[in-house]
């Protein structure tokens, strides 16, 4: 019986260490349900942001990972997906492997409101109006001037987009983080 308990303890620690590598699991429910971005919208978002191989594309609420994976496959960019749902993180990680871009794309099980997004040169979003509005301040504070932001379907509240395009009847909004105001 004791050896069974030891075996269970070892198995649990192995599983726990694998989850820890994906990021500290947030302790709250997702703000939005996962709805995949259609492929033509993914393509349009990355084109609108003018993604290149020197970019680091962060997808907040990355779901199955399709946006960072497309950025890596199509443009050679590095990608980081952040999602609060550990099942989505596992799915996205498997999708990156099956698409041959696991060396360029990372998925983190983190809360998008507390995650470090400062390395991003491009940020993509498909969340909701209220979540985007709450996120706008973090984007302005944490991102470097010149970082491009692209959102599918929802704007950033009072922060007016520089450009809006429509693809298959779906709006896509584009912003560039401005220089910090002088004091």
What are these regions, as identified by a protein language model?
Residues 78-83:
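Conserved SAM-binding motif I beta-strand of class I
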Residues 117-134:
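A short SAM/SAH-binding and catalytic strip from SAM-dependent methyltransferases
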Residues 21-52:
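Class I SAM-dependent transferase core
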Residues 130-183:
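C-terminal substrate-binding/active-site "lid" region of AdoMet-derived donor-dependent transferases
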């Amino acid at each position: 019986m004791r050896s069974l308990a030891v075996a269970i303890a070892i198995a649990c620690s192995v599983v726990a260490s694998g989850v820890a590598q994906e990021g500290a699991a947030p302790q709250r429910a997702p703000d939005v349900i996962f709805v995949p971005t259609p492929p033509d919208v993914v393509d349009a978002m990355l084109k609108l942001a003018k993604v290149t191989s020197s970019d680091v594309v962060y997808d907040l609420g990355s779901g199955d990972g399709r946006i960072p994976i497309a950025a890596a496959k199509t443009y050679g960019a590095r990608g980081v997906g952040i999602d609060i749902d550990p099942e989505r993180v596992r799915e996205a990680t498997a999708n990156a492997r099956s698409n041959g871009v696991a060396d360029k794309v990372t998925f983190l099980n983190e809360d998008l409101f507390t995650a470090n997004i400062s390395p991003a040169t491009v940020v993509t979003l498909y969340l909701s109006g209220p979540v985007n509005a709450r996120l706008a301040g973090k984007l302005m504070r944490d991102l470097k001037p010149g970082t491009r932001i692209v959102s599918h379907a929802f704007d950033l509240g009072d922060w007016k987009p520089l450009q809006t395009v429509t693809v298959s009847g779906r709006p896509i909004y584009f912003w560039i983080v401005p220089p910090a105001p002088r004091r």
